[in-house]
Amino acid sequence: MASNIFTQTNIAVIWDFDKTLIPGYMQEPLFRHYNVEGRTFWREVKALPEHLRREGHEMVAVDSIYLNHILAYVRSGLFKGLSNRLLRELGGELEFYPGLPEFFPAVKDHVAKNPLFGKYDIKVEHYIVSTGLRQMILGSKIAEHTDGIWACEFVECRLPPGYLKEGKPQS
């Protein structure tokens, strides 16, 4: 007879980020850095889906359309010099709800020290899944307490058509 009735012993806790771990939106430090009024940005984002539908774009993902608007700000020069390094730095300005990030390691520690959980080799893992900017989350004080972060990446350089010659990147 099997000594362990559990075939999976890791408990994965999946967290959203904005308004779950922090009281507002992670983009606020970005707006402050570039002196952009956040309310104006979000009002524009809210109006984008209807505007794009009128242009024939029916399948606009409402949760991530703000990313296209960030790119519009980059192209227009309003977010001049935006980089992953800067996003990570700005992530350090994010303020978390009281008790965070301390709650993450406290839960892991509680489970690890509890003999009942130890008997079955039960462990807790914390993951963040967000439509936010991954580099900002990685720069925040909660990142070191997570087991994985899935979020949107800002691709700084786009490779031109034909960048692969014979299956290898060309320098």
Where are the regions a protein language model picked out?
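Alpha-helical substrate-recognition element adjacent to the catalytic core
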Residues: 1-162
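Short, surface-exposed amphipathic charged segments that create phosphate/polyanion-binding patches used
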Residues: 161-171
